Amino acid sequence: MADYKKSSVHCHSTMCDGKNTLQDMASAACAQGLTTLGFTGHSYTQRDREYCMSPSRTAQYKATIAKLKAEYKGKVDILCGIEWDILSEDKRTGYDYWIGSAHHLYGKNTGKYYEIDFRPQDLWDCINDDFDADPLSAVEAYFAEVEKVAALKPDILAHIDLIKKLNANGEFFDEESPRYKAAALKALQAAKDNDCLLEVNTGGVYRGYRKDFYPGAWLLGEWQKMGGKVIITSDSHDINSLTYGFDEAAAAIKAAGFTSVQVLTGNGFETQEL
Protein backbone atom coordinates (compact mmCIF):
# COMPACT_ATOMS: atom_id res chain seq x y z
CA MET A 1 0.00 0.00 0.00
CA ALA A 2 1.27 3.47 -0.86
CA ASP A 3 2.74 5.39 2.08
CA TYR A 4 3.95 8.96 1.61
CA LYS A 5 6.23 8.54 4.63
CA LYS A 6 8.21 5.88 2.80
CA SER A 7 8.63 7.55 -0.60
CA SER A 8 11.12 10.35 -1.21
CA VAL A 9 11.33 11.25 -4.89
CA HIS A 10 12.87 14.73 -5.14
CA CYS A 11 16.46 14.05 -4.11
CA HIS A 12 19.89 15.39 -5.01
CA SER A 13 23.39 14.03 -4.50
CA THR A 14 27.01 15.05 -4.98
CA MET A 15 26.42 14.49 -8.69
CA CYS A 16 24.91 17.99 -8.64
CA ASP A 17 24.50 20.24 -5.58
CA GLY A 18 23.78 17.63 -2.92
CA LYS A 19 25.98 16.84 0.07
CA ASN A 20 25.94 13.03 -0.01
CA THR A 21 26.73 10.49 -2.70
CA LEU A 22 24.11 8.47 -4.54
CA GLN A 23 25.26 5.40 -2.61
CA ASP A 24 25.02 7.21 0.73
CA MET A 25 21.52 8.41 -0.08
CA ALA A 26 20.40 4.91 -1.06
CA SER A 27 21.94 3.37 2.05
CA ALA A 28 20.25 5.97 4.26
CA ALA A 29 16.90 5.44 2.55
CA CYS A 30 17.14 1.72 3.24
CA ALA A 31 18.17 2.27 6.86
CA GLN A 32 15.31 4.72 7.36
CA GLY A 33 12.74 2.25 6.08
CA LEU A 34 11.89 3.90 2.78
CA THR A 35 10.39 1.74 0.06
CA THR A 36 10.96 4.21 -2.80
CA LEU A 37 13.86 6.59 -3.43
CA GLY A 38 13.78 8.76 -6.52
CA PHE A 39 16.88 10.65 -7.61
CA THR A 40 16.32 13.90 -9.49
CA GLY A 41 19.69 15.41 -10.31
CA HIS A 42 19.68 18.91 -11.77
CA SER A 43 19.75 18.79 -15.56
CA TYR A 44 22.58 20.49 -17.41
CA THR A 45 22.07 24.18 -18.04
CA GLN A 46 24.90 25.74 -20.01
CA ARG A 47 24.03 29.25 -18.80
CA ASP A 48 24.52 28.28 -15.14
CA ARG A 49 26.81 25.31 -14.55
CA GLU A 50 27.34 25.97 -10.84
CA TYR A 51 24.62 23.69 -9.49
CA CYS A 52 23.84 21.15 -12.22
CA MET A 53 25.24 17.94 -13.69
CA SER A 54 27.59 18.18 -16.67
CA PRO A 55 26.82 15.94 -19.67
CA SER A 56 29.55 13.49 -18.64
CA ARG A 57 28.37 13.48 -15.05
CA THR A 58 24.80 12.88 -16.23
CA ALA A 59 25.98 9.68 -17.91
CA GLN A 60 27.78 8.66 -14.73
CA TYR A 61 24.64 9.48 -12.73
CA LYS A 62 22.52 7.16 -14.86
CA ALA A 63 25.07 4.35 -14.71
CA THR A 64 25.46 4.57 -10.94
CA ILE A 65 21.71 4.56 -10.36
CA ALA A 66 21.36 1.50 -12.60
CA LYS A 67 23.79 -0.33 -10.30
CA LEU A 68 21.95 0.86 -7.20
CA LYS A 69 18.65 -0.36 -8.63
CA ALA A 70 20.12 -3.86 -8.84
CA GLU A 71 21.84 -3.63 -5.45
CA TYR A 72 18.69 -2.58 -3.60
CA LYS A 73 16.20 -4.69 -5.52
CA GLY A 74 13.65 -6.11 -3.10
CA LYS A 75 14.62 -3.56 -0.44
CA VAL A 76 14.11 -0.10 -1.92
CA ASP A 77 12.73 0.78 -5.33
CA ILE A 78 15.39 3.13 -6.73
CA LEU A 79 14.13 5.44 -9.48
CA CYS A 80 16.21 7.44 -11.95
CA GLY A 81 14.59 10.81 -12.43
CA ILE A 82 15.75 14.27 -13.43
CA GLU A 83 14.90 17.76 -12.25
CA TRP A 84 14.71 19.40 -15.63
CA ASP A 85 15.09 23.17 -15.71
CA ILE A 86 13.33 25.31 -18.31
CA LEU A 87 16.77 26.56 -19.44
CA SER A 88 18.16 23.05 -19.85
CA GLU A 89 19.60 21.66 -23.07
CA ASP A 90 19.19 18.10 -21.78
CA LYS A 91 16.61 15.67 -23.08
CA ARG A 92 13.78 14.78 -20.73
CA THR A 93 13.51 11.25 -22.09
CA GLY A 94 15.30 8.18 -20.78
CA TYR A 95 14.27 8.66 -17.16
CA ASP A 96 11.72 6.95 -14.93
CA TYR A 97 10.08 10.36 -14.41
CA TRP A 98 10.94 14.03 -14.55
CA ILE A 99 10.33 17.03 -12.34
CA GLY A 100 9.91 20.38 -14.09
CA SER A 101 11.32 23.54 -12.55
CA ALA A 102 12.41 27.14 -13.05
CA HIS A 103 15.32 28.70 -11.16
CA HIS A 104 16.40 31.65 -13.31
CA LEU A 105 15.31 34.94 -14.77
CA TYR A 106 16.69 36.46 -17.95
CA GLY A 107 17.69 40.12 -17.80
CA LYS A 108 16.67 41.89 -21.00
CA ASN A 109 18.91 44.88 -20.26
CA THR A 110 22.12 43.11 -19.30
CA GLY A 111 21.65 39.78 -21.07
CA LYS A 112 22.40 37.99 -17.81
CA TYR A 113 20.68 34.93 -16.37
CA TYR A 114 20.06 35.27 -12.66
CA GLU A 115 19.54 32.40 -10.23
CA ILE A 116 16.64 33.61 -8.10
CA ASP A 117 16.94 31.22 -5.15
CA PHE A 118 20.60 31.32 -4.16
CA ARG A 119 22.32 34.65 -3.49
CA PRO A 120 20.23 37.62 -2.29
CA GLN A 121 22.57 40.01 -4.10
CA ASP A 122 21.88 38.26 -7.40
CA LEU A 123 18.16 38.78 -6.91
CA TRP A 124 18.70 42.43 -6.03
CA ASP A 125 20.86 42.92 -9.13
CA CYS A 126 18.23 41.20 -11.23
CA ILE A 127 15.46 43.46 -9.96
CA ASN A 128 17.42 46.70 -10.10
CA ASP A 129 19.34 46.21 -13.34
CA ASP A 130 16.82 44.31 -15.43
CA PHE A 131 13.36 44.91 -14.00
CA ASP A 132 13.51 48.68 -13.50
CA ALA A 133 13.77 48.25 -9.71
CA ASP A 134 10.26 46.78 -9.67
CA PRO A 135 10.35 43.53 -7.66
CA LEU A 136 6.87 42.49 -8.73
CA SER A 137 7.88 42.66 -12.38
CA ALA A 138 10.53 40.06 -11.56
CA VAL A 139 7.90 38.01 -9.73
CA GLU A 140 5.63 38.13 -12.78
CA ALA A 141 8.50 37.06 -15.03
CA TYR A 142 9.30 34.15 -12.73
CA PHE A 143 5.75 32.83 -12.70
CA ALA A 144 5.68 33.18 -16.49
CA GLU A 145 8.66 30.79 -16.56
CA VAL A 146 6.70 28.37 -14.39
CA GLU A 147 3.87 28.53 -16.93
CA LYS A 148 6.34 27.47 -19.63
CA VAL A 149 7.41 24.50 -17.52
CA ALA A 150 3.81 23.49 -16.85
CA ALA A 151 3.05 23.56 -20.58
CA LEU A 152 5.58 20.74 -21.05
CA LYS A 153 3.48 18.49 -18.78
CA PRO A 154 6.11 17.31 -16.29
CA ASP A 155 5.35 14.30 -14.12
CA ILE A 156 5.77 16.62 -11.12
CA LEU A 157 5.86 20.43 -11.10
CA ALA A 158 8.50 21.63 -8.65
CA HIS A 159 8.32 24.37 -5.99
CA ILE A 160 5.84 26.54 -7.90
CA ASP A 161 6.50 29.63 -5.75
CA LEU A 162 10.28 29.27 -5.36
CA ILE A 163 10.62 33.00 -6.08
CA LYS A 164 9.67 33.58 -2.42
CA LYS A 165 12.61 31.56 -1.03
CA LEU A 166 14.77 34.57 -0.12
CA ASN A 167 11.79 36.72 0.84
CA ALA A 168 10.92 35.28 4.27
CA ASN A 169 10.74 38.72 5.87
CA GLY A 170 9.39 40.56 2.86
CA GLU A 171 12.79 41.96 1.92
CA PHE A 172 12.07 41.94 -1.80
CA PHE A 173 8.30 42.07 -2.34
CA ASP A 174 4.90 41.79 -0.68
CA GLU A 175 3.54 38.27 -1.07
CA GLU A 176 0.06 39.57 -0.22
CA SER A 177 0.04 42.11 -3.03
CA PRO A 178 -2.59 41.68 -5.77
CA ARG A 179 0.11 41.53 -8.46
CA TYR A 180 1.97 38.75 -6.67
CA LYS A 181 -1.17 36.71 -6.17
CA ALA A 182 -2.40 37.28 -9.72
CA ALA A 183 0.90 36.06 -11.18
CA ALA A 184 0.96 33.02 -8.90
CA LEU A 185 -2.63 32.12 -9.74
CA LYS A 186 -1.91 32.42 -13.45
CA ALA A 187 0.91 29.88 -13.08
CA LEU A 188 -1.36 27.69 -10.99
CA GLN A 189 -4.01 27.77 -13.70
CA ALA A 190 -1.38 26.72 -16.25
CA ALA A 191 -0.51 23.80 -14.00
CA LYS A 192 -4.16 22.78 -13.87
CA ASP A 193 -4.67 23.22 -17.61
CA ASN A 194 -1.78 20.82 -18.20
CA ASP A 195 -2.87 18.32 -15.54
CA CYS A 196 0.32 18.79 -13.53
CA LEU A 197 0.97 17.08 -10.22
CA LEU A 198 2.09 19.75 -7.76
CA GLU A 199 4.69 18.97 -5.14
CA VAL A 200 4.38 20.21 -1.58
CA ASN A 201 8.07 20.77 -0.99
CA THR A 202 9.53 20.95 2.54
CA GLY A 203 13.07 21.85 1.48
CA GLY A 204 12.91 25.59 2.13
CA VAL A 205 11.84 24.95 5.72
CA TYR A 206 14.54 22.33 6.30
CA ARG A 207 17.25 24.70 5.10
CA GLY A 208 15.94 27.55 7.23
CA TYR A 209 14.86 29.88 4.44
CA ARG A 210 11.11 29.69 5.05
CA LYS A 211 8.58 28.77 7.71
CA ASP A 212 6.06 27.72 5.07
CA PHE A 213 6.28 25.15 2.32
CA TYR A 214 6.23 25.50 -1.46
CA PRO A 215 3.44 26.25 -2.22
CA GLY A 216 2.27 28.43 0.65
CA ALA A 217 -1.04 27.82 2.40
CA TRP A 218 -3.16 30.21 0.34
CA LEU A 219 -1.83 28.93 -2.98
CA LEU A 220 -2.28 25.34 -1.82
CA GLY A 221 -5.87 26.19 -0.93
CA GLU A 222 -6.45 27.60 -4.41
CA TRP A 223 -5.00 24.43 -5.91
CA GLN A 224 -7.47 22.37 -3.90
CA LYS A 225 -10.35 24.50 -5.19
CA MET A 226 -9.14 23.81 -8.73
CA GLY A 227 -9.26 20.08 -8.08
CA GLY A 228 -5.50 19.66 -8.34
CA LYS A 229 -3.43 16.78 -6.99
CA VAL A 230 -0.36 16.93 -4.74
CA ILE A 231 2.67 14.87 -3.79
CA ILE A 232 4.88 15.42 -0.73
CA THR A 233 8.61 15.91 -1.38
CA SER A 234 11.60 17.10 0.62
CA ASP A 235 13.90 18.34 -2.16
CA SER A 236 16.51 16.46 -0.18
CA HIS A 237 20.17 17.40 -0.56
CA ASP A 238 21.45 15.21 2.29
CA ILE A 239 20.71 11.97 4.11
CA ASN A 240 19.03 13.69 7.06
CA SER A 241 16.27 15.35 5.07
CA LEU A 242 14.86 12.47 3.02
CA THR A 243 11.44 12.69 4.67
CA TYR A 244 11.83 15.94 6.55
CA GLY A 245 8.53 17.60 7.46
CA PHE A 246 6.36 15.01 5.72
CA ASP A 247 3.82 14.80 8.55
CA GLU A 248 3.64 18.59 8.76
CA ALA A 249 3.18 18.77 5.00
CA ALA A 250 0.39 16.20 5.19
CA ALA A 251 -1.28 18.29 7.90
CA ALA A 252 -1.03 21.41 5.71
CA ILE A 253 -2.50 19.48 2.80
CA LYS A 254 -5.42 18.28 4.92
CA ALA A 255 -5.95 21.80 6.25
CA ALA A 256 -6.24 23.00 2.65
CA GLY A 257 -9.10 20.57 2.10
CA PHE A 258 -7.37 17.68 0.35
CA THR A 259 -8.36 14.13 1.25
CA SER A 260 -5.52 12.32 -0.50
CA VAL A 261 -1.98 12.62 -1.82
CA GLN A 262 -0.17 10.99 -4.70
CA VAL A 263 2.75 8.70 -3.88
CA LEU A 264 5.36 7.62 -6.41
CA THR A 265 6.28 3.95 -6.04
CA GLY A 266 8.10 1.37 -8.09
CA ASN A 267 4.78 0.73 -9.81
CA GLY A 268 4.12 4.37 -10.67
CA PHE A 269 1.91 6.95 -9.01
CA GLU A 270 -0.60 5.70 -6.45
CA THR A 271 -3.23 7.50 -4.39
CA GLN A 272 -3.10 7.49 -0.61
CA GLU A 273 -6.07 8.66 1.42
CA LEU A 274 -5.24 10.99 4.29
Language model: regions and residue ranges:
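An N-terminally biased module of ancient metal coordination in phosphate/nucleic-acid-related enzymes
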Residues: M1-I86, K164-P178, Y206, I231, ...
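Glycoside hydrolase catalytic-domain groove-lining segments
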Residues: L166-N169, D174, P178, L185-L197, ...
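Long, positively charged, glycine-interspersed low-complexity recognition regions
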Residues: D212, G216-L274
